[in-house]
Amino acid sequence: MGPGASSATRRMLALPIDGHLFFAGEATDTEHPATVHGALASGQRAAAEIQAADKPGPIVVIGAGVAGLGAARDLTAFGREVVVVESRQRIGGRVWSDTVGGAPVDLGGSWLHGLRDNPLADLAASLDIDLVHTDYEDAALFDADGRPMEWAHLD
């Protein structure tokens, strides 16, 4: 699926198979695709679909990214037995911070697209995570080699 995919394509990608295999991930979210917000929303949607399918037994969630963790959290809240499997030695999927030169650096999703009606903003607040307002007036732009660029180059 390429950039700019339609909502219909995203809905099709999210369709369950045989009532047993459910899909989540930011690419399946029609309102916030390509965002962490969309990943979380897709996990919540998949969890609701799984619960509505009313199939007995434990549920396996493949992937401990935001979509998988969101689905697992909601399914657990529904009282379901959930096992999350992850291929990496860490959770979070594309949301990842590391230390570079003694300073924390975000290597994945790190920006909330709006605070109003964004469940990630609520989650950040509940975890006492500081949020910093984006100041577009004072933003800097750099090329792939780290050299400063003028914004006019983007026009």
Question: Which residues fall in each region the model found?
Answer:
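FAD-dinucleotide binding site
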Residues: 1-155
